[in-house]
Structure formats: C-alpha cells, structure tokens
A protein has these predicted regions:
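Hinge/capping helix and adjacent helix->loop/strand transition within the periplasmic-binding protein
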Residues: 30, 56-58, 80-90, 102-189, ...
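An extracytoplasmic/periplasmic, membrane-proximal ligand-sensing/linker region
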Residues: 30-32, 267-336
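N-terminal (or domain-start) structured segment
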Residues: 24-114, 152, 160, 176-205, ...
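Bacterial N-terminal signal peptides
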Residues: 9-19
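C-terminal lobe and pocket-closing loops
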Residues: 209-281, 326-336
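A ligand-binding cleft/hinge motif common to bilobed small-molecule-binding domains
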Residues: 96-107, 169-174, 201-237
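Bacterial N-terminal signal peptides that target proteins for export
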Residues: 1-10
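Short coil/turn segments
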Residues: 42, 96-97, 131-136, 158-162, ...
Length: 336
C-alpha cells in the first residue's frame, strides 16, 4: 500500500509538472500586440506585415495593431521596438538587409544574430522602373543616359538602407555610374515620385511598383536578378544580367522581428503560429503571386541563416561604396 501510494504521488507530481510546462509554453496575449512598421504606409514592409498580421490574429487570439513610424531609413521605428518592454507585445518588421545597414552606417547598434527572433514571410526583388514618359525603352538606353550625364539621372528610393538604395548601389558597383539620389519616407512615396515625374526612375521593389507597372505608369526595364520576373497582369520583365553579365544579388527577405529577451513562451507560441498558419497561408501566397514576390516563410535558425545570407553582402556593399561608417569585419560580419 505504501509503495502504491508513493507511485500515485509521483505520478501526480509528474502530471502537475507537465501541466505547468504546457501552461508556460502556451502564451495567451491579454491585450493587443503592436507591430511597428518603420516605413511609410503602402510600402513593401507595410503591405506584407498587414497580410501576416491579419492571418496571425486568429491564431494568437488577439488584435494586432500596425503602427507606421518612418524616419532615418527605418532605424527610428526599429529602435523603438528594440527599446520597448520585453513583454512580447511590441514587434517590428522589415527586410533583413535593413538591420545590416543600420549597423555599418552607425544608425543603430543592433545585430540580427543576437538581438532579434526572425520570422520571414516573402523574398522580394527590385525592379529598374522608369517614368512612362521618359525616352528609355530598355536598360541599355538608361545605362547610356547614366554615362552621358553622370550624376544627373534622378533615382527615387526610400532612403539609405532601403531596397531601392541597395538596388541602385548594386548597379553603381557593377557599372561605375553616378546618379542623383532623391529619398522619400517609404517605398510607396518613392514609386509615386517616379510616376509623377519628380524623378526619372526608381529601383524600389516589384511589390511596390506592381500596380503602376500594370497601369502603364511605370515602364519596367529590368528585374535585379539572373532570372526574368513574370508579373501577373503585365508579363515578363527581363533580368538585369541580360546587360550586366556578372551582376549578383540574393533574395531580399522580409518578415517580422521580435526583440530578444521576451519570454520564451512568447517565441514558442509565435513559432507554432508561423508554422501552422503563415507557412500554409493562401493569402500570403496570393499576395506574393500578385505582386512579384517569392513565398518563402521560415523561422528559427533557418530564418536567421536566410536573413544573414543577404545581410552580410549588403553590409559589405555599403562599406566598399564608401557609404558606411563602421567596417563590417569589426562588428563580426566577415566578407563573403
């Protein structure tokens, strides 16, 4: 009898322990989650974050509020998320490359590998798009204009660290061109500037230019890839390697970033939601297909590895171009 009682007591302790672990693993938010989008409304980060947030609300059982806080190439909103209480209720979003440029440009002392839990959703590509009224019919004509009037062709981007700025800097790296940089508080305003004629061109992402391309307000000359881009409602956009044979760039991964230091059960719960909802989401897939993005959700180590694969070369692109204040190798980013 004594032995049976002891066994029963041990079993009861185990049941209670398992229950406690289960309770700790299941985070149930009791107030809305805020995602700080550190760019303007309507841009690439804003678009995909709103799609993912709507999908996650049901899985997490709470409202998710998107707050746009543009400024200093996204570093202001990102810092606000990083400095917020580590209770799991304040996240941010963006491209992995943003975090690389903040570090080497001295904008924000943050490291993607130590300071953030990364949840990726899509990968984006930049497009060389020109105002439909410009005379440039293909990329070779635009390149000739860059060379015949150095520093005069106007390029709209969302500012330092943005996908558009990375794109034009890559063209500069491979061709030696100079350009006149005109910056805006987000990809959408940059695209609108190109459409209105404030600038001749933009190198923002396909997802930001898609509607204007379909509406024939922007003429796409090349996609920054070694493969053509088939955009729904438009057709094929040729790869930039047709003109710049050795051009290389990787996919620009976008997602949601949760600061390190939040309770483990927050991350465990969001990872389960990402696996069960975002990685199977028809709405995220539809978004990617319609706007020229690649459906590429991941989390954990896989997301960290993917993010670093673009973060690393971008950090060195800025350093080699003389547009960084901090050498990447001094902050643990080896040359690829």
């Amino acid at each position: 009898m004594k032995l049976s009682a002891r066994i029963l007591a041990t079993a009861l302790v185990l049941v209670l322990a398992v229950g406690a672990v289960s309770a700790q693993a299941n985070w149930k938010p009791n107030k809305p989650i805020t995602i700080i989008v550190p760019w303007g409304a309507g841009g690439s980060t804003d678009q995909i974050t709103r799609v993912c947030a709507a999908e996650l609300e049901a899985a997490l059982g709470t409202k998710i509020v998107i707050v746009n806080q543009p400024g200093a190439s996204g570093s202001v909103g990102t810092k606000n998320a990083l400095d917020a209480p580590k209770d799991g209720y304040t996240w941010t979003a963006g491209a992995a490359a943003d975090l690389a440029t903040y570090k080497v440009q001295g904008m924000l002392d943050t490291d993607i590998r130590k300071d953030w839990h990364i949840f990726l959703s899509v990968a984006n590509v930049s497009v060389v798009g020109v105002n439909a009224m410009t005379p440039y019919k293909d990329f070779s004509e635009l390149l000739a204009a860059f060379k015949s009037k150095p520093g005069q062709v106007t390029v709209a981007t969302a500012g330092q660290s943005s996908a558009g700025h990375i794109g034009i800097e890559l063209i500069r790296k491979y061709t030696g061109i100079e350009y006149k940089h005109v910056t805006y508080d987000g990809g959408n305003p940059a695209v609108i500037a190109c459409v209105s004629g404030e600038t001749e061109m933009t190198t923002q992402l396909a997802v930001e230019q898609a509607d204007m391309i379909r509406g024939k307000k922007i003429r796409p000359l090349a996609v920054m890839s070694d493969k053509a881009l088939n955009l729904d409602g438009y057709g094929e956009i040729p790869p930039i390697t047709k003109w710049i044979k050795d051009f290389k760039t990787g996919p620009n991964y976008f997602g949601i970033f949760i600061p390190a230091g939040v309770p483990k059960n927050v991350i465990d719960t969001v990872e389960r939601a990402w696996k069960n909802v975002i990685m199977k989401s028809a709405k995220v897939q539809d978004y990617a297909k319609a706007r020229g993005a690649m459906f590429a959700p991941s989390y954990g180590k896989e997301a960290q590895d993917r993010a670093f694969s673009y973060y690393q070369p971008v950090a060195w692109l800025y350093w080699d171009a003389g547009k960084a204040k901090v050498s990447p190798d001094t902050v643990g980013i080896p040359k690829p």
